[in-house]
Design a protein with these regions (language model features):
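Helix-breaking motifs and short loop linkers at transmembrane-helix boundaries and internal kinks
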Residues: 34, 86-92, 230
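Extracytoplasmic gate region of multi-pass secondary transporters
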Residues: 201-240
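Cytoplasmic helix-loop-helix junction between adjacent transmembrane helices
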Residues: 96-134
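Juxtamembrane intracellular "pre-TM" segments in multi-pass secondary transporters
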Residues: 176-204
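Conserved MFS/SLC helix-loop-helix module at the cytosolic interface between two early adjacent transmembrane helices
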Residues: 53-91
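Extracytoplasmic
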Residues: 10-40, 55, 217-222
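Short hydrophobic/small-residue motifs within alpha-helical transmembrane segments
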Residues: 47-49, 136-137, 241-245
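Helix-loop-helix hairpin linking two adjacent transmembrane segments in secondary transporters
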Residues: 90-92, 121-175, 220, 224
Length: 252
């Protein structure tokens, strides 16, 4: 794997882990913030809202070199996860989670462009899949590791490690990812012209309903494994490894 793709995969790992780690540590977070588990689910929603809002960065940052955007996204992830680690009240954690979600969608769009551009001829798809593998690894290993840390030590440590990882990723992106030119500017209207065809709307609907179903299950996976399934808290990380493995197999 090229070092540049490895650097991008590192960023994908951070964002994948930051998105899903809250599912595994929801009970501990709810206790620390003195809220109910359903109310703590808003920390997951705040991240999702950040993802939606953050995609606008690509719309208004279309003239910025992609490498600079990746560095910006990792800096935002650094701030968001640092704030999550030190949050002392529920509103602060909500804001921190919103900030953490801002770079998510925009990162994958930009990283895909870079991965395709830097790939050897005929290996564009492989290059992109290797970049996305960072998020897959986060689902299978990163999230269970965060759950284990929360159970053994503190849920704050999971976010602190992600913040440190974001800082490291900024360094390797600066060092390993070459600069490429921004994509040809088609204007704001041009970026949405594809929506005049029915095909993209069908894809968007499929993604919407598919992700809605996954998040309905995944958001409260830790509480229902313990309270409904009867599993002990120490078994949750191992069960989440199996869930992550299922995602990997499903993706294949």
């Amino acid at each position: 794997m090229k070092r540049s793709i490895l650097a991008l995969a590192s960023g994908a790992f951070i964002l994948g882990a930051a998105e899903f780690v809250m599912m595994g540590i929801l009970p501990q977070t709810a206790t620390a913030m003195h809220v109910s588990i359903p109310a703590a689910g808003h920390y997951i929603s705040a991240y999702a809202i950040g993802v939606c809002v953050g995609t606008l960065i690509l719309v208004f940052g279309r003239k910025v070199p992609p490498k600079h955007l990746i560095i910006l996204f990792m800096a935002i992830a650094l701030v968001g996860n640092t704030l999550s680690a030190v949050s002392f009240c529920s509103p602060m954690l909500l804001v921190a989670r919103f900030i953490s979600g801002l770079p998510h969608g925009a990162f994958f769009g930009t990283a895909t462009l870079i991965a395709k551009t830097l790939a050897d001829k005929g290996k564009e798809a492989q290059s992109v899949s290797m970049m996305v593998m960072g998020q897959t690894v986060a689902n299978m290993l990163g999230v269970p590791a965060g759950t284990l840390l929360a159970e053994a030590m503190s849920w704050r440590l999971a976010f602190a490690i992600l913040a440190a990882w974001a800082l490291m990723t900024i360094v390797v992106v600066i060092s390993w990812v070459p600069s490429i030119d921004p994509i040809k500017d088609a204007g704001i209207k041009g970026q949405f012209r594809f929506l005049t065809h029915p095909g993209p709307w069908l894809i968007l609907l499929a993604v919407f309903f598919g992700n809605s179903g996954i998040f309905c299950w995944w958001s409260y996976v830790s509480p229902w494994l313990q309270k409904t399934g009867g599993w002990s808290a120490t078994m949750v990380p191992m069960l989440m490894v199996l869930a992550g493995l299922g995602m990997v197999v499903g993706g294949i």
